[in-house]
Structures are given as C-alpha cells and as structure tokens.
Amino acid sequence: MNHNRLIAKEIAAIVPALEQETILNLLEKPKKSSMGDLAFPTFSLAKTMRKAPQIIASELVGQINNSYFEKVEAVGPYINFFLNKSEISAQVLKEVIKKREDYAQAAIGQGHNIVIDLSSPNIAKPFSIGHLRSTVIGDALSNIFQKLGYETVKINHLGDWGKQFGMLIVAYKKWGSEEAVRAHPIDELLKIYVRINAETKNHPELDEEAREWFRKLENNDEEALALWQWFRDESLMEFNRLYAELGIDFDSYNGEAFYNDKMEEVVQLLAEKGLLEESKGAQVVNLEKYGIEHPALIKKSDGATLYITRDLAAAIYRKRTYDFAKAIYVVGQEQTAHFKQLKAVLAEMGYAWSKDIQHVSFGLVTKNGQKLSTRKGNVILLEPTIAEAVKRSLAQIDTKNPDLVNKEAVAHAVGVGAIKFYDLKTDRTNGYDFDLEAMVSFEGETGPYVQYAHARIQSILRKADFQPQATENYQLNDTESWEIIKLIQDFPNTIVRAADNFEPSLIARFAIHLAQSFNKYYAHTRILDNSPERDSRLALSYATATVLKEALALLGVEAPNEM
C-alpha cells in the first residue's frame, strides 16, 4: 500500500477541488517523527475555501477516519498523519517474506530495451580508477532498470581505432616482443607506446611512418589489420580478467572500429537532407537554432570523418538493432557539449528518437585533490588497487572472525564491493577523492559497513533457526522498528527515483540508512529473548537482510552471509 496515494485519496474525497496528483505533490515528510509520518499543508486551499489555513486543517481532520491511520492531527496549517504501525508492519513484512528477492520488482519497463554505453577503455592503455566510474555506474543502472522490467543492453564501446594504432604498429615492429605482449599485454604495449612518443621528438620521421601504417590500416592492409586485431584481442583478454574481478559483463564490445564502414551513410544522409555546410573546407552542421554556438564538424577538409560522425553512426545502428526506449551514455562531464551536438544533429536528421538519448555524466576521481593523468604518471591502476583492498579486507576479517571458513572469498567480495560502493554512494555529478583506507573501513558510510550489517542479521537468523512464514501475521509498533519498516516500504520508490534520475547513489544511501537503522535497533532490542514479539522481531530482521542484499545487488556488490 502506498501511504502517499492513500492520504491523497482521503483528502481528495473531502476536498473535491484538488486532484489526487496535486495533493501527492504537496505532501511533505515532517522533520521530526514525533510530528507524524506525512503532513499535508493547507495553504493552497485558503483562497478557494476562503478560510485561514489553520481553520481548514482543524475542520478537515474531523472528516478523516481510516484504520490505516493511528491518528490524524491538525498542527497549525498542517494535517499530520500518523500511520498505523501494527497494521503496516504486518503488511510490509508479509510482502517481503512472500516475494523475497523479488520484492520491489516492477513491470514499468514492459520489456522495452535500454541501451547503456559504459566503460569503453582504450585498447593498449591500462585500466585505471578513472575508468571505474563509467563502468560501475553503467552496470548499476542496468541492474536498476532490469529490476523495473526493462531489458538492458550493455555496450562496451572500446577505443579501438585511431592514429595511435599506427604509432603502436611502428613501435612493435621496432622494439616489440610477441612473448612479452602475450605475457603482459597492456604493460608491454603501453611501454612501447610511451617509448615511440618520446622518440618522435628527436626522430620526426617516426611520426610519418606511423601515419603511413594507419593509412594502411584504413585501407585494410593484411599485415596492419592482423597486428591491430592482435593488439585488440590481447588487450580485451586483459580487460575481461579485470571485469571478471569486478563481476561485470557486457552484451557487446562493438567499439569505434565497428563503425568504420557505417559513417559514409551518415554523411550521405546529412547531404541528402541539405544539412551539410562548408566551413574552411570542412563539412559541418549548423546547430544555432538549438542554442549551440559551435557547428558539428562532420568531415575535415582532408575528407577524414570525426568522432561525432562515428557516434551518429553508432546511435543509428543501435536504434535499428535494438529499437531502444532509451540510449544512455555513461560518459564524463567533459563530453557534455559533444552529446548536446549529437542529440541536435539527430533531431535535425528527423529522428524523433533523439529525445531518448541521455548523457549520464559524472564527476572526476582525484587523489589528494589532484586530477589523475596517465601521461603525467599520476594514475591509480585498478588491478593493484583491488589486490590491496582485498588484502586490507582480509586483515580486518582475520581480526573480527579468525575462524571464518571461506575468508579469502569473503575478503574478495568485501574488497571489490568496497571500491564499487564508495564510487556509487557519491552523487554521480560530484567527484570524489580516492581514499582506499576509508573505502575498506567496516565503520562509517561504506560498503563493508552495509555488508557487515547483513552478515550480522544472517548470524541472528541462524542462531534462532528462524524460517519466516508468509502466512504469519508479524506485527510491531515500537518507534525503532517503525523507522526500519518505513525504509523497507520505501525501497520500491527509491528504485524508481534512482532510475528516473539515473542516480545509483540513491540506492547506496538507502542501504546505508537501512543498515544504520537496524544497527540502532539491534543495540536497543534483545531480538533473541523469549517474548511475544520475538518472531516479529526476527521477521523484521529477515526482511531487513533481504532488502539490504537486494540493494547491494543492484549496485553490483555481493552480500556475504558471514564476515
């Protein structure tokens, strides 16, 4: 039962002048729980009813009579609703126990496709913490939309094309070793790439040699293509090892190269629609009517196509292939102008679905307040970071629970979960400063804190040998259990809000609040004592663990049963 809708229905029945949706938008959550669970301000009725809001509130209170409310009070211009704790706790616990991990599952998406462009590292470049944000935000959004009944397609749009491959081919032919590349693909390819960039300062002829090899690659030269494919395959194998560590997979690895033969169609379509203009020898699309000052550069004066041309081809291909309801691009804030241009050009081409393209931007990860940069050597690589997080998690588990049987597997779940959760708890439009010690802490607003709350509840349930029954009428009416019940009941709404705002941090913050509320309850309540409320308290514990586990799962974080 949705409290807000119930209250809106009650008020609409006695105030026909107000629509239910209007009332819903006016409902507020009181700052103090002693003031009720929800409040309706009557200011908007003063004009039509020609009375002071305080009088309106007093008169309306007397007309509301529903067993769903413990009491309804007029406090000044507000009508404060106190929900019936016993009745609602029984309903909520029954629903969670019955549905288990399917609690909060919805059919909003009706099976429609959502395409998510995420991660997208560059071939032959190391996978750093900077790449993590797009990867974990995109994966969490995929889980969230699936929970709401959408089908999702996760596309890893690899950076697998460009002039740097000419450089890489020259570098490999001069200094490369097949054995070394096979042993450590990313490290070795990066080493020779850095070397050739340094060498070109004193040997500019290497630059021309690299351009020549890239021309060969564009013209499907057999040797150039074979080397490019090998670099790509070796790099992808390395990336997939890291993705497996993170517990993340993809539906497509179609990267930049995939669209090489699809860009000319875009240029032709733009020409046919009369959208191309010449500017200093280049072909551009004017976007001033969309409030975009700079035109979209489609083709350079030398005939080379550009990044936006490739993205236009990708968007059109994805619409044709997946018929998406939404196409989400999880890409940093620095690309905001690019995606505005992309949407505007698609709109100019007459594609009504351009409105379904969504740039989900995010802030930077810094270290000690400094921007991370591969070129400057100020970079945090993901693989050693995961290893260190797992090591630190294992040390804490050794202290807390030295006899834990599968502690290495648990430490991996905690270490990886800590890194992902710390990223996802931050509002995505904000950046955060990388702090591994804070990430893996079992205290504070962290992934391990939430995981530990879940493991603690599982321990309680094992001790009690408790098996919840959906047919039982579990009821609670104390203040601390009520805070937990309200949070659990709000979980479905939280998921919808997270999807509407493309904001996984709402799920992470929810999980933190639920874990905190349960820990407070646990500190003040003897759950296992023999009392009339024992089974209801255990049912509440079970429901909390179920929802915590599901919230973590939406973020791509495991919830160990023991820690």
Curated annotation (Swiss-Prot):
Compartments reported by the entry: Cytoplasm
UniProt-listed Pfam families: Arg_tRNA_synt_N (PF03485), DALR_1 (PF05746), tRNA-synt_1d (PF00750)
Keyword line: Aminoacyl-tRNA synthetase, ATP-binding, Cytoplasm, Ligase, Nucleotide-binding, Protein biosynthesis
A biological process term (GO) from this entry: arginyl-tRNA aminoacylation
Entry-linked CDD domains: Anticodon_Ia_Arg, ArgRS_core
Motif residue range(s): 'HIGH' region: 121-131
EC number: 6.1.1.19
Superkingdom in the source lineage: Bacteria
InterPro entries: Arg-tRNA-ligase, Arg-tRNA-synth_N, Arg-tRNA-synth_N_sf, ArgRS_core, DALR_anticod-bd, Rossmann-like_a/b/a_fold, tRNAsynth_Ia_anticodon-bd
GO MF terms, alphabetically ordered: arginine-tRNA ligase activity; ATP binding
Subunit structure: Monomer.
HAMAP family listed in its UniProt record: Arg_tRNA_synth (MF_00123)
Similarity section: Belongs to the class-I aminoacyl-tRNA synthetase family.
Record's protein name: Arginine--tRNA ligase
Gene that this polypeptide is encoded by: argS
